[in-house]
């Protein structure tokens, strides 16, 4: 599979032999940057954290909503990395304006899902602290379109599992195009991962098929562009 040549700085990191497009950059940040970012995450005020089943998170930049996001200024420790990633051109002419910080303890995960239409169809993720496996799945409705025999449609996550990507600490992952829009993604709640040939980016990583990796606490910075932003003046009823 050939690179699209839209992102010359990323072309050499394209994960091959999978639907377009995933770019995996190991050691995107240094260990000292990782330590700095983790300090900033855990120094955030307690009200910034939201506890969900299987993870907890922080929203930075605003709360995305179907009617529009009331944009908030990003802190400088995040702005540096949103600027860096935006400069790669992955959001077109736009700059990232939203960061979701997730914390996953070993044994935690998130069910297969799609990010939905509130976001520009590209997601970028910096991983901190520990590895994980990001799994991709064929949606049931896509399988229904591709087979004429309803009985053959896979019904379980295991049957619909298409591929996985190993996300190592300090790595950057960019997912866009068909892989972003046509497939579900999730993280299986496990305490360890045995790497199989289904892990599509082993050739881009330091790990090997058959390795078993123990999960620790992982923090992810999910950096995106939210196109629909509300102006504060409109929210306050001004500018009529």
UniProtKB/Swiss-Prot annotation:
Residue positions binding 2-oxoglutarate: 102, 104, 218, 220
Keyword match Transmembrane helix: no
EC numbers for this chain: 1.14.11.-
Binding residues for Fe cation: 113, 115, 185
Chief subcellular location: cytoplasm
Keywords linked to the UniProt accession: Cytoplasm, Dioxygenase, Iron, Metal-binding, Nucleus, Oxidoreductase
A cellular component annotation (GO) from this entry: nucleus
Cofactor note: Binds 1 Fe(2+) ion per subunit.
Cofactor list: Fe(2+)
Gene Ontology molecular functions: dioxygenase activity; metal ion binding
Domain Fe2OG dioxygenase: 95-227
Record localization: Cytoplasm; Nucleus
Summary of the function given for this chain in its UniProt record: Probable Fe(2+)/2-oxoglutarate-dependent dioxygenase involved in oxidative demethylation of nucleic acids. Binds nucleic acids with a preference for ssDNA or ssRNA to other types of DNAs. May play a role in nucleic acid damage repair.
Family, similarity comment: Belongs to the alkB family.
Protein name: Probable RNA/DNA demethylase ALKBH6
Organism of derivation: Xenopus laevis (African clawed frog)
Gene that encodes it: alkbh6
């Amino acid at each position: 599979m050939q690179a699209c040549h839209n992102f010359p700085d990323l072309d050499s990191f394209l994960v091959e032999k999978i639907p377009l497009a995933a770019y995996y950059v190991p050691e995107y940040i240094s260990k000292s940057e990782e330590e700095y970012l983790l300090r900033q995450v855990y120094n955030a005020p307690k009200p910034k954290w939201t506890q969900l089943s299987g993870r907890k998170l922080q929203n930075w930049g605003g709360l995305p909503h179907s009617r529009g996001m009331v944009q908030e200024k990003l802190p400088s420790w995040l702005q540096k990395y949103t600027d860096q990633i935006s400069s790669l051109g992955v959001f077109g002419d736009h700059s990232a304006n939203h960061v979701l910080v997730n914390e996953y303890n070993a044994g935690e995960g998130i069910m297969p899902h799609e990010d939905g239409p509130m976001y520009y169809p590209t997601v970028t993720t910096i991983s901190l602290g520990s590895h994980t496996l990001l799994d991709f799945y064929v949606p049931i409705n896509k399988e229904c379109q591709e087979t004429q025999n309803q009985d053959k449609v896979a019904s379980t996550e295991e049957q619909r599992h298409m591929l996985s990507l190993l996300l190592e600490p300090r790595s950057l992952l960019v997912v866009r195009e068909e892989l972003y829009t046509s497939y579900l993604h999730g993280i299986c709640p496990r305490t360890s991962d045995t790497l199989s040939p289904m892990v599509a980016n082993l050739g881009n990583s330091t790990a090997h098929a058959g390795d078993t990796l123990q999960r620790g606490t992982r923090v992810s910075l999910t950096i995106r562009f939210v196109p629909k932003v509300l102006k504060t003046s409109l929210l306050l009823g001004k500018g009529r």
